[in-house]
Amino acid sequence: MLMARQHLSARLHGRRPARHRAVSIVLALGMAGVAVAACSSSSPVAAPHNVTTTTPRPAHTAPSTTTTSRRSTATPSPPATTTPEQPGWTVVSRLPSGIAVDSHSSRRSNGDLVTVLRFHAGLVHYALHVGSIDPPTDGAALPAVARPAIGAREHAQLLAAFNGGFKMGAGCIPCGVGGMEVAGRVLFPLVRGMTSLVLNQSGGASMGVWGQGFPPAGAAVYSVRQTLPPLVSGGRVSPNVGDVSAWGATLGGGLLTARSSVGIDARGNVLYAASMSTLPSDLADALVSAGAVTAMELDINPEWVQADTARSPGGPLRTAVPYQYRPADQYLSGWTRDFVTVLSGP
């Protein structure tokens, strides 16, 4: 498939499009909550709290949601392979307690290759980082595991990192982008009807549509990333997936561009899907094939789509999206936009 010619958009700050044939990527990230790396003494962590929500014009049907809970560490179990090798999947990273990352590749009807990288629930936890420019923090003191660069302590646990959602204030009209909360601080008001990746203070994750039975009453909300209504709801592709304009402005107005997305399956594995030239429907199909129950689009356009993985915690990082613009160590040195880290645990 040839990439559509792309030009600079006034709303999304992308670079020139990739000139290579794009290959789709899906990262499946296991979401059991375990302790996030300790914060620096100079940056106290805010306690989880109730958040304020706003209501956009359209209403959306709530999808099924899946929540992962923190594993008890009071009586550690002996190391055991909790995730056996599966036919058709290749082990990428193995921890003493089991396979943390494995991969599977398939080809879409249009010929594009889709690679699924699966991070297994119970073996990883997560942290949401702000960028140096977006979202604006207004000088809020944030812990080390929420800042624009990955610190040394967090790096020692790092298995993967991937880009966040749309720039705050950008996106489709009238659906809006959504809000964001980081380390207990609401940076942009959270919006009802927007798909939400929610992290608790231990790094456990869940996903659902905000304000439609999600998050459940009493849930400990520590960080939230929202982007658009669901791309996948109840294990089914959104009926609006064919309306490409509803999924963000592309460079030059073409249909094909770099896109990314994140979802969660019934086992609590989190899925990240991306390609440097694709349609929203391609991402949705790949996520559903990988077992996604709920999923949302993340950022689009070539400058912002990025995922990196390591074979072992703290090991050398490799780019996971073929032909992505940014180097594999970009998040280590710091980045302008928000991103999520995937850390080994416990």
Located regions from the model:
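Extended C-terminal subregions enriched in glycine
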Residues: 208, 234, 250-346
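C-terminal motif of bacterial Sec signal peptides marking the signal peptidase cleavage site
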Residues: 35-38
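N-terminal export and membrane-targeting signals
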Residues: 5-30
